[in-house]
Every structure is written in C-alpha cells, then in structure tokens.
Amino acid sequence: MKRRSLLLSLIAVSIAAAVSGNAMAEDALSTILARKVIRVAVPTDYPPYGSVGTDMTPRGYDIDMATLVAKKLGVKLELIPVTGPNRVAYLQTKKSDLTISSLGKTPEREKVIDYSIAYAPFFDAVFGKQEIIAKNYNELTGKVIAVTRGSMQDEELSRLAPGAVIKRFEDNNGTVSAFLAGQAQMFATGTAVAATIKTKDPSVSMDLKVILSNAPCYIGVQKGEPQLVAKLNEIIREAKSSGAIDEMSKKWLGAPAGSLPE
C-alpha cells in the first residue's frame, strides 16, 4: 500500500513538473531570457523611425527603442526587417518576439495582438503638391493618393475619405516613390517621414493637406503574454521618467515626446 502511494506521489510530481515546464515554455518573457536573445521586428524603409544608414546598419527611433529594451532585459538584440503589411504577421507566426515598427493601435489589430503603453509620438496626414487644393476629407474625393498597404494610413484613409482613389504599395519606399514619380497626386504618411523627404530634397513640391489622425506608437506583442507586456511597460515608464524617451524623440523627430498615453 505504501509502495502504491509512493508511486502515485511520484506520478503526481512528474505531471506537475511537466505542466510547470510547459507553462514556462509558453511564457514569452521566460523564453527570451533563457534564450538570451530578443527578436524584434523593425522598419528599414520608414525614416526617421527605421531606415538603413550608409554603413548598411539599421538606424532610427524604433531601432533605438529596440536597443533600449534589449539592454534593460540583459539580452542580445536580433533585428528583423519588416514592412507595413507583414509586421503584425511576424508576431502572429512567432517569427519575432516584439514588433517595434511605428505601430498604431486599432480595434482590428487588438483582436490579434497585444500592446505595450505608448513609446513614441506619431501623427498621420495626407501630403500633396502645393497646387492641389484639399482642405478636408470631402475634397480628397477623386484624388489619386498613394499609401502603404495594411498601414494605419491605409485604414484611416479608407474610412475617412472613401471617395479617394487609393493606390496601395507594398512598402513605404514604394508609396513615396509613386508620389515623387507622379503616379499619385498625393500620399498618406507620418509627418516625420514627410519632414525627412523635404529635408533630403527641399525642391520637392509638397504640403500637408489633411490630418488623418494623431496616434502614438506602441510595441506589439503576441496575444496572451501579460508578463512580457508588464515588463515592457516597466521599461517604457522608466525611460519616460529618466528623460530617455524625450531624448530619443528629440534626436529623431526634432522635439520631445511630451505626454504619451498609458
């Protein structure tokens, strides 16, 4: 009888250990810390949030944020270049642990991924040639507007200006190139991106026409990872308190981040 009780106890302990092991394996934060590497999806076609420098090294606000997260976790950083259309898919298929890619929060995305608190300011607008008149959403009707497929700007433009002729491109470079080449009268992007274009070539005829939204950036996380989300929020709050976020924003966007939503 004692032998049978001992056997049952051993079985129970084994099952508990297996369950505990599986739980740890399913915890993204524990996996990252054990692996000693964090895989972060970042943009390389969306300056100043993410681009490739002359030395072929990724640079930008999002890259600096990814570097800060890795440093605070004490792990090595692995950067994974993504575009607007695939940055959420990389999270869903577990090709990345995080997406730090000027990601806005939408009801559709909240169904499939979770978010940290905001880490960067960002607002979207429609830009066009100076001679084009468009002061509101109605005046965008019939105008050919380039946009990156699956981006926040794509969603906003489709909802706010259904009468616009929207031409979708697979990445930000394609969107900007279409406007510069005259394939579109206007294009939708973030104001920081537009400022970068103007800085590189002041001769470009381009004015802000209509603001689409003022939506900050969040870190995207796989669904059901509360420990990882909590740790990211802790890192971001500390960076806001220390002034690191404001310094990052001044470096890449030309102004402090200011008050960011929780």
Language model regions located:
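Acidic, polar ligand-binding/catalytic clefts
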Residues: 67, 71, 76-139, 203-205, ...
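Extended ligand-binding regions for polar small-molecule ligands
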Residues: 63-72, 134, 138-139, 143-144, ...
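Ligand-binding cleft/hinge of the Venus flytrap
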Residues: 51-54, 66-75, 137, 153-169, ...
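Ligand-binding clefts/hinges and TM-proximal coupling segments of bilobed small-molecule sensing domains
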Residues: 26-27, 152-169, 206-208, 236-262
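Alpha-to-beta junction loops
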Residues: 38-39, 74-76, 93-101, 162, ...
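Short helix-initiation/N-cap motifs at beta->coil->alpha
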Residues: 63, 78-89, 152, 167-177, ...
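Periplasmic-binding protein-like
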Residues: 120-128, 195-237, 255-262
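Extracytoplasmic small-molecule ligand-binding "clamshell" domains
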Residues: 25-102
